[in-house]
């Protein structure tokens, strides 16, 4: 694991000691080299002997999420260049350092062997994200968004810390390898049900579960582009990863406790998709669509079947890349029009035809057509939920329909129609932006050729 953590940490001195005009180029190139060098981790031996140590381990559940995290660092750096072009060199280097620190804590979260280390790193991601939102956000509301993000996350996480200390005292270990052998004798009591709730609530806030999601649209809308990318692509997946780990350990309890959360997720999935239909703000629409997709993942994790686990992990990876790409496209519009309102960006297809092609591809993938991995993930989840209860086909089908409607609405509002006057003299699309979109799209297309490497533990 150190072969990914140490080179990532060494990007910090690289950023500070490199010459001012080479800061972006050097950090982007070296981070891209790290992401390419870490792709071999996707090949997991059956006994997991290559990636096991007392502190860190990788299995087929954490590896795809880890690779997604590492892959996103150069993309965040590429996307942020225009946003910081007017800032001082010190600001640029501080921004890059903050992103790298966030990256390191994310890598260590996905690779942690011990639950207390997972908790510490899970909370450590909060500080750099807060700094990115509140220091480099665009509007004054960023402080409000930062406080929402902070309090929701901390209020959800405090019971988890108390519960982990209780488990440590009771069982004597928090090691993820040991716990399956120690938690076999959990009884269905009120106290153990509360233990399950406190363990999962921190991750449900991070997902977020419908009802605990109010921090997400605010944080997404006010964050700069790198903040939006890392929030959508990885921080939401931290919640899914934590829930997958915890619910497998507390397995008999999950089957007693899952019903209200399943109902809430089914309801929230349709509600947030419907909210998307009446959004005027581009980033807010993409943020609410993230809540809708993550509700599907919560349903899959709660159902506790091999197919649903495979669907949850596949959809998390697919959504991470797709939503990150949509945020990059929304940001490219914002950099030209200086507004997130969709109707003001109408008619951009005639001015930026190549960017319109990227919009079309991203919108299509968001609608989950064959042969994308989005479809594979959604099919696995819908099939599993249908086998649990036939009635789930109605909210699931309605959600698929509304998702198609709001995605087409977003696409047509921003790209088609008569060009507004203020958009006549905008900048053309840059090679940097086209490269950024291609690097989002390439993994999605390649994974659709061989999806089994991201299907997780149960494949």
Swiss-Prot record:
Q: Which residues form the signal peptide?
A: none
Kindly report the protein's main subcellular placement as a broad class. mitochondrion
Q: Which reaction does it catalyse?
A: a ubiquinone + NADH + 5 H(+)(in) = a ubiquinol + NAD(+) + 4 H(+)(out)
Give the GO terms filed under biological process for this record.
electron transport coupled proton transport; mitochondrial electron transport, NADH to ubiquinone; mitochondrial respiratory chain complex I assembly
Quaternary data: Core subunit of respiratory chain NADH dehydrogenase (Complex I) which is composed of 45 different subunits.
* Organism of this sequence: Elephas maximus
Superkingdom in the source lineage: Eukaryota
User: Mind telling me what this protein is named?
Assistant: NADH-ubiquinone oxidoreductase chain 4
- Which top class of enzyme applies to this chain? translocase
The primary gene name is MT-ND4
């Amino acid at each position: 694991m150190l072969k990914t953590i140490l080179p990532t940490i060494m990007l910090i001195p690289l950023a500070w000691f490199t010459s001012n005009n080479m800061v972006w180029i050097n950090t982007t190139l070296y981070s891209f080299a790290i992401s390419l060098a870490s792709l071999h981790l996707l090949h997991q031996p059956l006994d997991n002997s290559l990636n096991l140590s007392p502190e860190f381990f990788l299995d087929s559940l954490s590896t795809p999420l880890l690779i997604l995290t590492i892959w996103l660092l150069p993309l965040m750096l590429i996307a942020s260049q225009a946003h910081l072009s007017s800032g001082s060199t010190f600001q640029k280097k501080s921004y890059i350092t903050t992103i790298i620190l966030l990256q390191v804590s994310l890598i260590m979260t996905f690779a942690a062997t011990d639950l207390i280390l997972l908790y510490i790193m899970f909370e450590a991601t909060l500080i750099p994200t807060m700094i990115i939102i509140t220091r480099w956000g665009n509007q004054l509301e960023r402080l409000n968004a930062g406080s929402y993000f902070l309090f929701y996350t901390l209020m959800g996480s405090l019971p988890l810390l108390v519960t982990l200390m209780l488990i440590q005292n009771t069982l004597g270990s928090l090691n993820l390898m040991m716990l399956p052998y120690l938690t076999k004798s959990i009884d269905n009591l009120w106290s153990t049900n509360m233990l399950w709730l406190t363990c999962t609530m921190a991750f449900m806030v991070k997902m977020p579960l419908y009802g605990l999601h109010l921090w997400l649209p605010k944080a997404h809308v006010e964050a700069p582009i790198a903040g939006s990318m890392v929030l959508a692509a990885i921080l939401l997946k931290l919640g899914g990863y934590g829930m997958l780990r915890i619910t497998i350990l507390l397995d008999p309890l999950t089957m007693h406790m899952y019903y209200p959360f399943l109902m809430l997720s089914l309801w929230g999935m349709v509600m947030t998709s419907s909210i998307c239909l009446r959004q005027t703000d581009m980033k807010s629409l993409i943020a609410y669509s993230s809540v809708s997709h993550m509700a599907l993942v919560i349903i899959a994790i709660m159902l506790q079947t091999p197919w649903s686990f495979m669907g949850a992990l596949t959809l998390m990876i697919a959504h991470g890349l797709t939503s990150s790409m949509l945020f990059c496209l929304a940001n490219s519009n914002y950099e030209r029009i200086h507004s997130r309102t969709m109707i003001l960006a109408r008619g951009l297809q005639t001015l930026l035809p190549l960017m319109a092609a990227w919009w079309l591809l991203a919108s299509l993938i968001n609608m989950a057509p064959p042969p994308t991995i989005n479809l594979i993930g959604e099919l696995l989840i819908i099939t599993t939920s249908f086998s649990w209860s036939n009635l789930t086909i109605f909210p699931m089908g309605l959600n698929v329909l509304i998702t198609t409607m709001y995605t087409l609405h977003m696409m047509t509002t921003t790209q088609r129609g008569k060009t507004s006057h203020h958009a006549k003299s905008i900048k053309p699309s840059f090679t940097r932006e086209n490269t950024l979109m291609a690097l989002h799209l390439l993994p999605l297309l390649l994974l659709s050729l061989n999806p089994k490497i991201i299907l997780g533990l149960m494949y």
